[in-house]
Regions:
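Glycine-rich flavin
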Residues: 1-26, 30
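Short loop segments at secondary-structure junctions
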Residues: 12-13, 39-43, 57-60, 84-91
């Protein structure tokens, strides 16, 4: 399930007004777009009340408190978001049904994340292979096992990516955590 949504939306003419906060968000680069869930307070009774919206970082009413000097995380541009009467036009509502949206994007999202991680791992392994004799070769015996694990994860990624719509959530999460 989802954690409680801390940004509330109110349907207004032409879109939504947002109020609330997001304690931790990453990739808050200047000129960027933020995608977030919103709990809509006045949604029609027979209609879902949790939406997914996009907000431009320079929109009026949005303040960002950047978390600077985080060990190894400075490049993530992370921070806390505060929304005060931020207007989101109707065309910036990605979905008015968060469950359906998450169902549709979870597999591709986790597969892309896993691909990035495996690509990084492949580069690291390629470079590490050049230095197996450093420190009297202490890591040489482990290297084939690490390569085998990498290859297994890569094969699982290819298998899941061949039919993402059929991929089980458990398998996607296991792959993502494995890399």
């Amino acid at each position: 399930g989802l954690a409680p949504i801390k940004v509330e939306g109110t349907l207004v003419e032409g879109g939504l007004k947002l109020n609330g906060s997001v304690s931790w968000a990453s990739n808050l680069y200047p000129g960027g777009v933020i995608v977030l869930p919103v709990a809509v307070q006045n949604a029609p009774e027979s209609h879902p009340n949790r939406y997914i919206v996009t907000v431009r970082q320079d929109v009026e009413g949005l303040s960002i408190d950047y978390h600077r000097n985080l060990l190894a995380l400075n490049g993530t541009e992370s921070g806390t978001l505060k929304f005060e009467d931020v207007f989101v036009p109707s065309e910036d509502v990605l979905s008015d049904n968060i469950e359906a949206f998450l169902h549709d994007v979870t597999a591709p999202f986790l597969l892309v994340q896993s691909s990035f991680c495996l690509g990084l791992a492949a580069g690291a392994l390629q470079e590490a292979a050049k230095h197996l004799d450093v420190s009297q070769g202490v890591f040489r015996p482990e290297f084939p096992l690490i390569l085998e694990e990498y290859q297994s994860l890569r094969e699982e990624l290819v298998r899941l990516a061949s039919e993402p719509e059929r991929a089980e959530r458990r398998d996607l999460l296991s792959l993502r955590l494995g890399v």
